[in-house]
């Protein structure tokens, strides 16, 4: 069409494309589609998005939609955007309506940072500082899904070594945004915990919340009990009313006095609630160390290494590295998760952007008791 204009840049989501888009339009609103696969707008979808944008004055409007995966159309609802929603993989869908005036302001105020990968991320963070980002809870378009990986595979993109260059850019954009809104954590002001002020029955407790893990729980418990340390420790298993053979298996291991088998009195606990049940128990040690019921420690010295790190770093929380593997312990992609996203000078800020900090995690128990885990079964560890 005569009205069409082709913009050429280094990448669809790069900074130069965002700037080209901003400088090439004088209209009130810009509909931005972030994929190359076929898209079908619903009846009066564009008019509806514009109507809501005008009524709310939003910097950006996004909506629920339908996704076509393997020939099947499914509803794809998205969630509301909040002040703290700075994860770079926040799901807006592939279609967003941008406020033209605020888009042009981005180009006017754009500084020297030119991102190859984080251009769109930088733009939407900027827009969130200019006005609201509004979720329109209506199914307004249909897109063809081009990433058919399972969600369990996608969630590790941020730690895949092949994506390291991408992650560095995302961290830079996120850090600039946090500074702009006055939310940047000053890493020079860390308080150091006092490891000597309280008495504990043991130095460390390995905590294993479990529900119906009859195939893996024995290996996890034995792995924990096999640790070699120069301090006393125990293993606290919170059995959340398993209905398979998990409880029977745990009872068979009870001959080891270091195993503390807890069954909550109520049935309303998620994984986070089970964690609280363990850390508040009288048997919990000075350091509470996570081990999932389907995980194994990589060596018999892992627990010693974790506790040593607490004392060496004067830290309130420790996160180690881990390796993805199958039931036969064969390494699975992306392999070793080394948590390069955490750095001493900016890790606490970058943590707000990424999809969590994986196992093994460990906490100074008095601080964990003070904060408490949310009683959920998803994201409870990341929240802590």
Model-derived regions, located:
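Acidic donor-binding loop at a coil-to-helix junction in glycosyltransferase catalytic cores
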Residues: 114-123, 378-384
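A conserved acidic beta->alpha catalytic loop
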Residues: 1-2, 38-39, 239-248, 267
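Glycine-rich, basic loop-to-helix element that forms the pyrophosphate-binding segment
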Residues: 9-25, 265-283
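A recurrent flexible, glycine/aromatic-enriched loop bordering the glycosyltransferase active site
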Residues: 74-98, 340-362
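Short, acidic, metal-binding catalytic loop of nucleotide-sugar glycosyltransferases
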Residues: 1-2, 222-232
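A conserved hydrophobic helix/loop-capping motif in glycosyltransferases and polysaccharide synthases
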Residues: 204-216, 220, 227-228, 238-239, ...
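Short beta-strand-to-loop acidic/aromatic patch adjacent to the donor-nucleotide binding site
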Residues: 26-40, 285-296
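Conserved donor NDP-sugar-binding/catalytic core segment of glycosyltransferases
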Residues: 38, 43-75, 301-334
